[in-house]
């Protein structure tokens, strides 16, 4: 409809009945007056608009009585005067533009397989409800919402997603509803030692850290790297390690992920046609203020006065001045626009015919004639255009207009015809094509998963999850397969389209596979790799892999195939960005585009449209071109921050964007109709449209027999080519060789590669091996086609066939740095050097029968080679004295052959023909050779090699690898000349060999029955040519051929990171690592159970005690909590117990061998206990104490009869052992540097060995003592009787700790507890007089002295950073026991629910509230979002509610105990709320607030009737607890350093304890007050009545936080909410005299009632399978009381009130404003109603003022301050002032942040607490006697006149007196008790110790503050 011009309404009169009368309308002379409307409106239009065929008046009055133009007899006359062809009548198209040609048409009957549209069209039935508007009027998409299955979650918008996507951290619903109200996710477990943890928690191999690749997906693995892999020439290295084009530096675009390419740049200058963004980037000036954020910082859209462009209807013309006129008024000779923009010369108007009318000769017009303003105007039929003469008509070629037809177009005279390719069908609009088949699905990689989404429905499903870093993607529709590449794993994988059967396709030789494409016709897989700069091809299963293109490739990225044309297309964004193409066999390579490209990412082909589309992330553009590169055009050039991948389907483009994390779509022709398909994705990468028509059928050039090819058949144009896998030679035109006979084999750390000598290109390919992390040494055995390699990352030696099959680990234990490897192909032996252990070892080629050959005088041995003909082996050693040595292959006849002019002798090689030894020296930069005995030394290549490493010989050539040039080179082996480079740009080159089949045969006696050896037969230079030997630690018997069965006597010792054994059965000492597959970080103490053959050890870093079999199997942790520094450990093999000392906790404990029934034996007067030994037969245990007063002690093995044996002349008593044969005690002292001995009672003490440098562990076996020494890093031995004959057992062992000597042949002693555990229910422990029964820590032994209680009854529960512990109050030891709750990080507050036995706690590191059972099971997150710093927590055990304070958000909230029904109770006038406590029986809620105005407040449990109890003389009120018996509150003040109490009304305030250091939390039980103290790191207690009898319950505990008491007497009582939740549907809150029902802040989908017992009806009817609608957050809290009747309201969904609810009085209809008709006046009744309303309000106010005046007579004078707040009100005894004097400087300095910690340095550990927790330096000064304070509970009172005051206190605290009565009684006795100050504050006395905060102590006077 045209805009309305002229006057609209002159006026209207108002009457009492609201009826308007109209005036006569009169327009000017130049205007036409339209008919008066029913509303009395007058409309004037320009006179020239009359009789122009347009309904300008709106009622056709301007067209009534007009003569319409005539139509020819062949045409149809439309109602609006338009003439159309009669054949167009009733064809379903609105050709008249007023639908008159489609009126009164007989209805068309649709076929059975068609759907009838409402506009009369018929479409295919399968198009109904497919998401496409096929009818044109959207009637085919008016569909019922699809029902979600049982395994799906329905989003709020109705779409369905997988059920397990709910609350998974990813926004899968388009509206984000799947991530609302979710518990917090459990943090990712920490990575192990060999892994690196990415910023978002994922673990990758540590070798990927700082390797230049984005393995994490967010570049966090490449940040903070001290050294980066260098970028290529022409590239710029970002700070994160990413390499980009150097031309992108300082260009205004942040191309680096960390924006480092735009730092320190001079201001860029933009041209006159460009706009400079705030970031410095230049964009087109025309993009300024166009509504699109082209700058990416929105600076091009700022300060735009009018960003919206005027819009006109499709049949209108937009004038330059913004007016809209009808298209018919163009070029009519009249200035309709008013600015002449509709006429010449602004418009190309046709000349007029000059005829007077259309009745004569059709006005001179060739087709149509019409009279316009009295003149003839010619027009043409649809399909024609008027020519220059203004008379004749010319055919319009619609096919020339791009996008006029979706696919094919045929032009006809006056018309056109669109047609579609096979597989498509023309839509009813006759122009667009719709693909036949199933509904299209967008398949995209999301880094961590692969998902699919329906583009028109928002249906979103998961295909594959738990991926590492999925980038590229493609599918094979016919075979129902999906393929993807993972750039973290460097692999290509595939799976079925249903997500099943995941398997690896290509697992080796990949570095950065960024592009992937499937040839669905010939079943081939193509991919690009920007790391290797290659394009490769293979079968769909990865077989027959071939490097297709590798020359002149830099960084190939996207790839697309056209199998029907046999063409491959790819993008390359190296230094010369381009798009290229070639045949699919690699031939016919050509450039498609190489200009105006920077970062061409995505690439796709429109097969039906015969075009290609690509995205450029640098230019922020989507472009298209023909397949030959012609007709290139930008489709979208703005609003594209970082497009990555693109796909096309039908007429739409779909692309992913990294910056917006979204999938978008637009029209493929125009770029218009842009739409966000999905956003808030994790990291969208590649994308494809999953549909059969995206892979149309094509001719398979290879046919059914693979083209007759033996391996690969690759299409090439319209033909094909047979090709061979890389390295295999072609025998003829169709066949390839089946094997490789000779090839160059080299290691490249991450893979092992080969270069075939059978082909001319010498391109390398990867042997497909798994899990190669850091390969160094290589060798091979052609007899079984095996390749062997060492890996210094996994510390393994492995082997596989040369084709990668049969891979297996050969040696995987006791390796540290296997640097050299050699195969004896004669005896099938494997030799290797280990630079970490400094050994040369040998084993069978399968790794069995391993033994140490040489272990002495080795210093970093490197390469090794063998010469079986002579029986010698040769190795290089490049330690402090570099040398080359040789020895017999059985270790005999060892000698140094080269020792001078060597620096880093690396690779070795033997020329068996000329008997020469070659070596490469990286320090000397030479390659040299000499005779096998070291003679005739000569330099082959000197001072010309940057860094040679690996070396090998073959034929007449020598080959070597070079680290610095990253190349493989060769030269003549005799002269060193004729050098050539075989391969370059190869990172991390290591060893090199040539695999061939011409090794010389050698005869040996070992080939005949193994030479008669029982185990190993080795070649030797001795006359027999061989010798027998045994595996390490096993003795060779006298026959020289047979080995003993195993170790009987051995040493076992801890070396921090492993446990090792040294056999004592053999004449030499060699340590063997116990192959325990567990992480060890700081293994200290060790013990052995010879009965079961198990070793036990403690790890003081991991804080655990573990055990395993001596062969490394059956490993397990037995103690994982409550350990700090377990320095000593002893196994009672007879009594089946394990004992240990803990220097951190100063305890000695015992437990069963599996860690159960743990008990603290000794805990008093211990100061760093260390070593411990047992004497079960005597019932004694002995230990050393390393503290300030070092000593040796003894007690019974049950902790009884404790005695100090020696306490003088001791320094650091470390190791300890008992000699049972001589009844002596031996110990090692690292300070006195002596090993001493004494009798078992401490007598006859004397020195045995002196000096010893730093002995640690000590043990004894037979006649010798053995000890470890930190200083010498060795194990020593001496005679146990004399201390003489000291020898070195093993050296070069850093990290030596404890040691034990074991003889498994020795018999065990008698078990004192017998076979029935002494009749004890739990522990039976030996003692000198027999045994005693004992219970686990904290549990009492019953009266029978045999049986234990099941669990403690009353105990303290407290938090300490990463732990929750308990202390039993039933026993006297008061030792803490860890509650085994997993995943604790920084626990602050906690509480307990005695009903279900669960502990609730807050973790401020994770910002969650969780709960768990006391045994650590059933841990779950209760509140997982919307928290900042939850410092206080309280459980309402009656109403089953949970309360908490949030210091970060300054709120107090509540929920059900399961976290549901969450509601904010108080969120105003809070400033750092801290502790919180509830009194369910009274309906009270208490909390502390220590913001600028510290205070303690109280409210009802619903937050109402808020009252400030105390706000004077407060500093930092931390902890808060209630004494439910005496009805008093207790709190600790960390600023004033005291503990105080008051009654429940804040009256009768008393200081209980002063001069406490830094109290944090407190609790109460019986007559005791317990509190935690940060400064003293202890839990203490005092008498709650007197404040005396102060005791330390637990000391030396870091990070103490909250503390509570769990007792049957603690959580008692009930209230109205205790029965059936008070009848409430959601929340029930008890109050002082009533209770209320309340609704959560966020609706949970269930109707909420505020009336007890009433369940409101659903707001609308729903089907059984349909979920109820979500209720809005509009439900207030409503009071329910037996004495008060309150009107209630209930709102339904969407805020609507049903009629039934309104009739019940549950709610009221909202007053919706109804807009009046134009010109209608206000009704008089409205004014009267308004006056009555005002009068009513005044009456209410007057009544309220009168009521308050009367009420003030009976209330406390201080309660006059009533402050209204929402949602409730609070009353305050005193006015709350927001301004206060600033706290002293120490306040700010000691304010706790989340990053702080309660220690002096504030940097040791990170505690996540926000300004709600304070740390105050203080001393342990004595607290005063509080002389001014007296209590009636503490004894007789000196002044009996104060007895009444105390009586008032008791009555008030019990609740029998209200506030007014209490105040009156206190005032009566004020004069009598004036000398008693119940809130006195004693003065501090004494000086403060130096704690590190001495000069920042709290100010002592108010004036200083």
Swiss-Prot record:
Disulfide bonds: 27-44, 34-57, 51-66, 71-83, 78-96, 90-105, 110-122, 117-135, 129-143, 148-160, 155-173, 167-182, 191-203, 198-216, 210-225, 231-243, 238-256, 250-265, 270-282, 277-295, 289-304, 312-324, 319-337, 331-349, 358-369, 365-378, 380-393, 399-409, 405-418, 420-433, 702-713, 709-722, 724-736
One GO BP annotation of this record: dorsal/ventral pattern formation
Leader sequence residues: 1-20
Compositionally biased tracts (Basic and acidic residues): 1882-1905
Chain ranges of the LDL-receptor class A domain: 26-67, 70-106, 109-144, 147-183, 190-226, 230-266, 269-305, 311-350
Main location: membrane
Protein name: Low-density lipoprotein receptor-related protein 4
Primary gene name: Lrp4
């Amino acid at each position: 409809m045209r805009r309305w011009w002229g006057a609209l309404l002159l006026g209207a009169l108002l009457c009492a009945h609201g009826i308007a009368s109209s005036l006569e309308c009169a327009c000017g002379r130049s205007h036409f007056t339209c008919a008066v409307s029913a509303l009395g409106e007058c409309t004037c239009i320009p006179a020239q608009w009359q009789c122009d065929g347009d309904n300008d008046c709106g009622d056709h009055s301007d067209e009534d009585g007009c003569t319409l133009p005539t139509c020819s007899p062949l045409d149809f006359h439309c109602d609006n005067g338009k003439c159309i062809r009669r054949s167009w009548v009733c064809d379903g198209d609105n050709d008249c533009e007023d639908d008159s040609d489609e009126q009164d048409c007989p209805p068309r009957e649709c076929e059975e397989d068609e759907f009838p549209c409402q506009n009369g069209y018929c479409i295919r039935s399968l198009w109904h409800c497919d998401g496409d508007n096929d009818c044109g009027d959207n009637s085919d998409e008016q569909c019922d919402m699809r029902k979600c299955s049982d395994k799906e979650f329905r989003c709020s918008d109705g779409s369905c997603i997988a059920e397990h996507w709910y609350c998974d951290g990813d926004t899968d619903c388009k509206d984000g509803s799947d991530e609302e109200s979710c518990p917090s996710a459990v943090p990712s477990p920490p990575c192990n030692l060999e892994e690196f943890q990415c910023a978002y928690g994922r673990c990758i191999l540590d070798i990927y850290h700082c390797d230049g690749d984005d393995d994490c997906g967010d570049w966090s693995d490449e940040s903070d790297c001290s050294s980066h892999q260098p970028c290529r020439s022409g590239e710029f290295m970002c700070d994160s390690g990413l390499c980009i084009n150097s031309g992108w530096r300082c260009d205004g675009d942040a191309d680096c992920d960390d924006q480092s390419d735009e730092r320190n740049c001079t201001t860029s200058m933009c041209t006159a046609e460009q706009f400079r963004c705030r970031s410095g980037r230049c964009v087109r000036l025309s993009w300024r203020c166009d509504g699109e954020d082209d700058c990416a910082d929105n600076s091009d859209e700022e300060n735009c006065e009018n960003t919206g462009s005027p819009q006109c209807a499709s049949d209108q013309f937009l004038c330059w001045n913004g007016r809209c006129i009808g298209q018919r008024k163009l070029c009519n000779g009249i200035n309709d626009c008013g600015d002449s923009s509709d006429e010449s010369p602004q418009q190309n108007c046709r000349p007029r015919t000059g005829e007077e009318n259309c009745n004569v000769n059709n006005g001179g017009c060739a087709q149509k004639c019409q009279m316009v303003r009295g003149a003839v105007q010619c027009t043409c039929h649809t399909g024609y255009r008027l020519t220059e003469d203004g008379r004749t008509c010319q055919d319009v070629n619609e096919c020339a207009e791009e996008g006029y037809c979706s696919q094919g177009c045929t032009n006809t005279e006056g018309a056109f015809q669109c047609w579609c390719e096979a597989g498509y069908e023309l839509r009813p609009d006759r122009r667009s094509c719709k693909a036949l088949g199933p509904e299209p699905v967008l398949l995209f990689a999301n880094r961590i998963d692969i998902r699919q989404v329906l583009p028109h429905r928002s249906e979103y499903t998961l295909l594959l999850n738990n991926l590492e870093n999925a980038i590229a993607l493609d599918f094979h529709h016919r075979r129902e397969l999906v393929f993807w590449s993972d750039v973290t794993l460097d692999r290509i994988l595939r799976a079925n389209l249903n997500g099943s059967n995941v398997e690896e396709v290509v697992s080796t030789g990949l570095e950065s596979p960024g592009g992937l494409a499937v040839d669905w016709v010939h079943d081939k897989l193509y991919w690009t790799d920007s790391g290797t700069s290659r394009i490769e091809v293979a079968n769909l299963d990865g077989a027959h892999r071939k490097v297709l293109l590798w020359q002149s490739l830099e960084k190939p990225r996207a790839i697309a195939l056209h199998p029907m044309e046999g063409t491959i297309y790819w993008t390359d964004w190296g230094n010369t960005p381009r798009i290229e193409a070639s045949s699919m066999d690699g031939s016919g390579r050509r450039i498609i585009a190489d200009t105006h490209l920077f970062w061409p990412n995505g690439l796709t082909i429109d097969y039906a449209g015969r075009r290609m589309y690509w995205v450029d992330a640098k230019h922020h553009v989507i472009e298209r071109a023909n397949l030959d590169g012609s007709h290139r055009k930008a489709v979208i050039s703005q609003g594209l921050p970082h497009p990555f991948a693109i796909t096309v389907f039908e007429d739409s483009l779909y692309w992913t964007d990294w910056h917006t994390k979204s999938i978008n779509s637009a029209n493929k022709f125009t770029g218009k109709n842009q739409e966000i398909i999905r956003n808030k994705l994790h990291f969208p990468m590649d994308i494809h449209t999953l549909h059969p028509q995206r892979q149309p059928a094509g001719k398979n050039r290879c046919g059914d027999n693979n083209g007759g090819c033996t391996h690969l058949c690759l299409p090439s144009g319209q033909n094909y080519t047979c090709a061979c896998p890389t390295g295999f030679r072609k025998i003829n035109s169709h066949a390839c060789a089946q094997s490789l006979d000779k090839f160059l084999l080299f290691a490249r750390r991450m893979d092992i590669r080969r270069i075939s000598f059978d082909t001319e290109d010498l391109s390398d390919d990867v042997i497909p091996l798994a899990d190669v992390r850091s390969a160094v040494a290589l060798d091979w055995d052609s007899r079984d086609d095996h390749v062997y390699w060492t890996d210094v990352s996994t510390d393994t030696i492995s082997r596989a066939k040369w084709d990668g099959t049969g891979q297996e680990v050969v040696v995987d234990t006791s390796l540290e740095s296997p640097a050299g490897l050699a195969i004896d192909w004669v005896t099938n032996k494997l030799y290797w050097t280990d630079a970490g252990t400094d050994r040369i070892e040998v084993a069978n080629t399968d790794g069995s029968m391993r033994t140490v050959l040489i272990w002495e005088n080795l210093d970093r041995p490197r390469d090794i080679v063998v010469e079986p003909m002579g029986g010698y082996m040769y190795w290089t050693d490049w330690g402090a004295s570099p040398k080359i040595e040789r020895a017999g292959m059985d270790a005999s006849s060892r000698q140094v052959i080269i020792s001078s002019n060597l620096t880093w002798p690396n690779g070795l090689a033997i020329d068996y023909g000329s008997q020469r030894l070659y070596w490469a020296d990286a320090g000397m930069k030479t390659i040299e050779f000499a005779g096998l005995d070291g003679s005739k030394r000569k330099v082959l290549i000197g001072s010309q090699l940057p860094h040679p490493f690996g070396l090998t010989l073959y034929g007449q050539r020598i080959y070597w690898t070079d680290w610095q040039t990253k190349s493989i080179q060769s030269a003549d082996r005799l002269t060193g000349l004729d050098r050539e480079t075989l391969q370059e740009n190869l990172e991390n080159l290591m060893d090199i060999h040539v695999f061939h089949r011409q090794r010389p045969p050698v005869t040996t006696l070992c080939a005949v029955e193994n030479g008669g050896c029982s185990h190993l037969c080795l070649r030797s230079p001795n006359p027999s040519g061989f010798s027998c030997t045994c595996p390490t630690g096993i003795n060779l018997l006298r026959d020289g051929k047979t080995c003993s069965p195993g170790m009987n006597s051995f040493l076992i010792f801890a070396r921090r990171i492993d446990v090792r054994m040294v056999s004592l059965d053999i004449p030499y000492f060699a340590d063997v690592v116990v192959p325990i597959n567990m992480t060890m970080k700081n293994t200290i103490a060790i013990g052995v159970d010879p009965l079961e053959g198990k070793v036990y050890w403690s790890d003081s870093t991991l804080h655990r005690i573990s055990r395993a079999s001596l062969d490394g199997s059956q490993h397990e942790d037995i103690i994982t909590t409550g350990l700090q520094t377990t320095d000593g450990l002893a196994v009672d093999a007879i009594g089946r117990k394990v004992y240990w000392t803990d220097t951190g906790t100063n305890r000695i404990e015992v437990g069963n061998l599996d860690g159960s029934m743990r008990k603290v034996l000794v805990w008093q007067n211990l100061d760093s206990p260390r070593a411990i030994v047992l004497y079960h037969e005597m019932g004694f245990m002995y230990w050393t104490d390393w503290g300030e007063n070092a000593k040796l002690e003894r007690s019974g093995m049950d902790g009884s009869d404790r005695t100090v044996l020696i306490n003088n002349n001791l320094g650091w008593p470390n190791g300890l052992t008992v000699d049972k044969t001589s009844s002596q005690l031996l110990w090692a002292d690292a300070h006195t540097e002596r090993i001493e001995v004494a009798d078992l009672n401490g007598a006859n003490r004397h020195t045995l060995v002196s000096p010893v440098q730093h002995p640690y562990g000590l043990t004894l076996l037979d006649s010798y003592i053995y000890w470890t020494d930190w200083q010498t890093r060795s194990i020593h031995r001496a005679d146990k009787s004399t201390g003489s004959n000291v020898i070195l057992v093993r050296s070069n062992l850093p990290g030596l700790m404890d040691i034990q000597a074991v003889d498994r042949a020795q018999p065990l002693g008698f078990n004192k507890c017998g076979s029935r555990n002494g009749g004890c229910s739990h522990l039976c422990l030996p003692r000198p007089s027999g045994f005693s029964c004992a219970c686990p820590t904290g549990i009492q032994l019953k009266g029978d002295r045999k049986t234990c209680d099941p669990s403690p009854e009353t105990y303290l529960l407290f938090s300490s950073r990463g732990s929750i512990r308990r202390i039993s109050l039933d026993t006297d030891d008061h030792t803490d026991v860890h509650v085994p709750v997993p995943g604790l990080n920084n626990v602050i507050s906690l509480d307990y629910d005695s009903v279900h036995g669960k502990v609730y706690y807050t973790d401020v590191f994770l910002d969650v509230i969780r709960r768990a059972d006391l045994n650590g099971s059933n841990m779950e997150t209760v509140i997982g979002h919307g928290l900042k710093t939850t410092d206080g927590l309280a459980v309402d055990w009656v109403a089953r509610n949970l309360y908490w304070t949030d210091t970060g958000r300054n709120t107090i909230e509540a929920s059900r105990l399961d976290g549901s029904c969450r509601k904010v109770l108080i969120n105003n006038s809070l400033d750092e709320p801290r502790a919180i406590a509830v009194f369910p029986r009274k309906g009270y809620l208490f909390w502390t607030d220590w913001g600028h105005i510290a205070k303690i407040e109280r409210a009802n449990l619903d937050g109402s009737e808020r009252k400030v109890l105390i706000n004077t003389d407060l500093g930092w009120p931390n902890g808060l607890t209630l004494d439910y018996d005496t009805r008093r509150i207790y709190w600790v003040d960390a600023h004033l350093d005291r503990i105080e109490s008051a009654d429940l009304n804040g009256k009768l305030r008393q200081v209980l304890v002063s001069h406490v250091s830094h109290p944090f939390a407190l609790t109460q039980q019986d007559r005791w007050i317990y509190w935690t103290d940060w400064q003293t790191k202890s839990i203490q207690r005092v008498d709650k009545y007197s404040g005396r009898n102060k005791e330390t319950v637990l000391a030396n505990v870091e990070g103490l936080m909250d503390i509570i008491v769990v007792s049957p007497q603690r959580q008692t009582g009930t209230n109205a909410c205790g029965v059936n939740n008070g009848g409430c549907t959601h929340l029930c809150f008890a109050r002082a005299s009533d209770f209320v029902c309340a609704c959560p802040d966020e609706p949970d989908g269930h109707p909420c009632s505020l009336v007890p017992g009433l369940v409101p009806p659903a707001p609308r009817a729903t089907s059984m399978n349909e979920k109820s609608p979500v209720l809005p957050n509009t439900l207030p809290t409503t009071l329910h009381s037996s004495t008060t009747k309150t009107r209630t309201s209930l709102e339904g969904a969407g805020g609507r009130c049903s009629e039934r609810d309104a009739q019940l009085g549950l709610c009221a209809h909202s007053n919706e404003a109804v807009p009046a008709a134009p010109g209608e006046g206000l009704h008089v009744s409205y004014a009267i109603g308004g006056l009555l309303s005002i009068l009513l309000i005044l009456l209410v106010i007057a009544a309220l003022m009168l009521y308050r005046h009367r009420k003030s007579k009976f209330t406390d004078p201080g309660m006059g301050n009533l402050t209204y707040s929402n949602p409730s009100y609070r009353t305050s005894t005193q006015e709350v002032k927001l301004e206060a004097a600033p706290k002293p400087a120490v306040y700010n300095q000691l304010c706790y942040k989340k990053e702080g910690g309660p220690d002096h340095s504030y940097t040791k550990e990170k505690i996540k607490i926000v300004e709600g927790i304070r740390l105050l330096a203080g001393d342990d000064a004595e607290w005063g006697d509080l002389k001014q304070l007296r209590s009636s509970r503490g004894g007789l009172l000196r002044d009996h006149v104060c007895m009444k005051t105390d009586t008032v206190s008791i009555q008030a605290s019990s609740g029998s007196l209200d506030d007014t009565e209490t105040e009156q009684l206190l005032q009566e006795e004020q004069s009598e008790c004036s000398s008693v100050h119940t809130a006195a504050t004693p003065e501090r006395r004494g000086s403060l110790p130096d704690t590190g905060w001495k000069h920042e102590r709290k100010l002592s006077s108010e004036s200083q503050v």
